[in-house]
Amino acid sequence: MIEKNKHMILYHGSIDIVENPEIRIPSRSLDYGSGFYTTTSYKQAEDWVKRKLNSNIQVGYVNVYEFDENLLESLNALLFDSPTEEWVDFVMNNRTNKDFNHDFDVVYGPVANDKVYAAFALYEGGIIDKQNLISELKAYKLVDQYLFHTDKALKAVKFIEAKEVTL
C-alpha cells in the first residue's frame, strides 16, 4: 500500500532547464517509448548531462522534480522492480518494433545502461537466451527510470529547481 502524502524526488538531466516537462517523441528507440524520462539517481542524471557537454555545450542541468506517489493509484502504471521476462519483452518491443505502442501513463523499472546494452546485444544475436540475460542483468547494480508517457501523468510532476553541471 502506498503511504499517504508520499512525495518522491526525481531528476532529469538536460542541456536545458526544464521547468515544464513535455512528452517527447524520441529520434531513436528508447527503453519505454516516448515521454519524459526521470530517475531517482542524481548521479545518473548528472552523468547523462556530462555525456552531452563538449566545447560547444559547456553547461547543462540536473532538473529536480517532486512526484506525488499517491497519484500512482489513479494512473495506469507499469512497474518493474527488477529485470524480468516481462521487462525484457517490453524493452525489446520498444527498441525493435517501430509499430509498438503502449497506453501506460507511467512506466518504472531498471535503466538499460552500456553494460545492459551489451547483454541485450548477446540476447538479440541468439548467443544467450532470455533466462541467461535476466541472470546477467540481475548481477549488475541497475539504476532506475520513470517514464511519464501521458500529459495526465506529467501533471503529477512538479519542478523544484535546476542544478548547473559543468565538466
Task: Give the role of each language-model region.
Residues 10-12, 37-38, 64-66:
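Short, conserved beta-strand segments within well-ordered enzyme catalytic domains
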Residues 27-52:
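Extended catalytic/binding region for NAD+/ADP-ribose chemistry, centered on the ART fold
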Residues 5-31:
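Short aromatic-glycine-(Arg/Gly/Cys) micro-motifs in beta-strand/loop hairpins
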